[in-house]
């Protein structure tokens, strides 16, 4: 049986990236929470 996680960089960024987070109100809340906590990487887009 095939495993469920088949990683794709493009999909990962499209779903969890900075631009994706900014497009929804809740996504912006996620970024605000991560900024408040002092995360060095806000989204997967920053992992470069």
From Swiss-Prot:
Give a yes or no for keyword Ribosomal protein in this entry.
yes
UniProt GO BP? translation
Q: Name one GO cellular component term.
A: ribonucleoprotein complex
- Write down the superkingdom of origin: Bacteria
Q: Which Pfam families match?
A: Ribosomal_L34
Q: Which UniProt keywords apply?
A: Ribonucleoprotein, Ribosomal protein
Task: Extract the coiled-coil ranges from the record.
Answer: none
The answer to whether UniProt assigns keyword Signal to this entry is no
Classification via PANTHER family:
LARGE RIBOSOMAL SUBUNIT PROTEIN BL34M, MITOCHONDRIAL RIBOSOMAL PROTEIN 34 FAMILY MEMBER
Q: Which family does it belong to?
A: Belongs to the bacterial ribosomal protein bL34 family.
- Protein known as: Large ribosomal subunit protein bL34
Originating organism = Metamycoplasma arthritidis (strain 158L3-1) (Mycoplasma arthritidis)
In the UniProt record, what gene is named as encoding this protein? rpmH
């Amino acid at each position: 049986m095939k495993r469920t996680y088949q990683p794709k960089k493009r999909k990962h960024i499209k779903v969890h990236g900075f631009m994706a987070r900014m497009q929804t109100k809740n996504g912006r809340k996620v970024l605000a929470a991560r900024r408040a906590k002092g995360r060095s990487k806000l989204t997967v887009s920053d992992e470069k």
